[in-house]
């Protein structure tokens, strides 16, 4: 039970943040393309890379931080199920090029963002 609480609280914070980002992106760009999911998944991947880099650098493990931020907040903030659904919505609307670009941008963007976060932390002075 000790590990469940930080995950639950972090998940609530992350899900709330995702909702706010989604509302802002929808108001800014409209519903034509799932910019909200693309942005939260890339930003969340960058944050995960930063977190992993910081935890590795600290050498203390930071189990509670990992549970709260990595599993809870970032698990609630990013969303693979929405990514999957939005791909199929684009595809079914006949927007196969946009659907393909969405997959590439999401996967490549998230991988690059996570790696960038880890590299950024490694560049900081000890």
From Swiss-Prot:
It catalyses: fluoride(in) = fluoride(out). GO terms for molecular function: fluoride channel activity; metal ion binding. It is a multi-pass membrane protein. Na(+) binds at residues 75, 78. Keywords: Cell inner membrane, Cell membrane, Ion channel, Ion transport, Membrane, Metal-binding, Sodium, Transmembrane, Transmembrane helix, Transport. Its main location: membrane. It is found in: Cell inner membrane. The keyword Cytoplasm does not apply. InterPro entries: FluC. Disulfide bonds: none annotated. GO terms for biological process: cellular detoxification of fluoride. The keyword DNA damage does not apply. Na(+) is not transported, but it plays an essential structural role and its presence is essential for fluoride channel function. GO terms for cellular component: plasma membrane. It comes from the Bacteria. Fluoride-specific ion channel. Important for reducing fluoride concentration in the cell, thus reducing its toxicity. NCBIfam families: crcB. Belongs to the fluoride channel Fluc/FEX (TC 1.A.43) family. This is Fluoride-specific ion channel FluC. It comes from Sphingopyxis alaskensis (strain DSM 13593 / LMG 18877 / RB2256). The gene is fluC.
């Amino acid at each position: 039970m000790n590990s469940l609480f930080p995950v639950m609280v972090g998940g609530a914070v992350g899900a709330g943040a995702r909702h706010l980002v989604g509302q802002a992106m929808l108001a800014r760009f409209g519903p034509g393309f799932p910019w909200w999911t693309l942005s939260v998944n890339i930003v969340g991947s960058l944050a995960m890379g930063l977190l992993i880099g910081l935890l590795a650098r600290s050498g203390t493990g930071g189990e509670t931080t990992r549970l709260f931020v990595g599993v809870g907040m970032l698990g609630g903030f990013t969303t693979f199920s929405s990514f999957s659904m939005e791909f199929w919505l684009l595809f079914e609307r006949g927007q196969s090029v946009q659907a393909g670009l969405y997959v590439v941008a999401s996967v490549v963007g998230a991988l690059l963002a996570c790696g960038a976060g880890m590299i950024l932390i490694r560049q900081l002075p000890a």
